[in-house]
Amino acid sequence: MRERVLALLRQVASGEVPVTDALARLSLPDTESLPFATIDHHRALRQGVPEVIFAAGKTGDQVLAIARRLAASDVGVLITRVPAELCDPLRSCFQGIEVNELGRIAYLPPAEPPGAGQGEILIVTAGTSDLPVAEEAAVTAHALGNAVARLTDVGVAGIHRLLSRTDALASAAVIIVVAGMDGALPSVVGGLVPVPVIAVPTSVGYGASFGGVAALLTMLNSCASGVTVVNIDNGFGAAFAASRITHGYAARGAQGVSQITQAVHSNS
């Protein structure tokens, strides 16, 4: 795909192809059909991020085949919900692939690094049991070109742990808060910071947590204004949303997050 795009851009530069025609061509679908999948090679051109492989429900051979085709385009490969039995085959097939077994996620960096987001994405977990979802978010955010920091096991059962790290909260551009049980931590964080807070309910908890539904409802009903909520255990979705925010900051120029934060503080 990269070679075809480069050839088209050269034709535009030489005047052989009008800009409007080139734009129309680049907007057309560019897919590759396998017996079990239709790979979207133009996803990166449309959305800025290549297609991501969701491994759950797929056989190991299917995941590897899709990954090989994406890797051949030099766009990088991100695979979520990787089962334990697929970790070693991925390492054998792809030199340089990073497999995070705790987060059940694998990442093969592209030939060229992705554009950098402005500022740091901080991932806060209520408890150690929330780490698998948090690691999915961390690897995803890194793969999308972001600086990532972690703040682990600072839930409301010992709120002093969080309050002793307000420096980390204050320096973040976007904060992802991952919590199960009662799901109260995002509201606490949302009441302390002026930056976007993305809440991720997890399925961690005893019976009446209903597999994360209790945490989800708590987060949806947060009294901290502006807390955004994604689906249960969806660390990937939270990181994707956070990355769009940081890349939006970057697109607005060098004024950066610090000036935005100062403006919010001055008006509060």
Residue ranges and their predicted role:
Residues 105-111, 147-168, 213-214, 230:
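Glycine-rich oxoanion-binding loops at beta->alpha junctions
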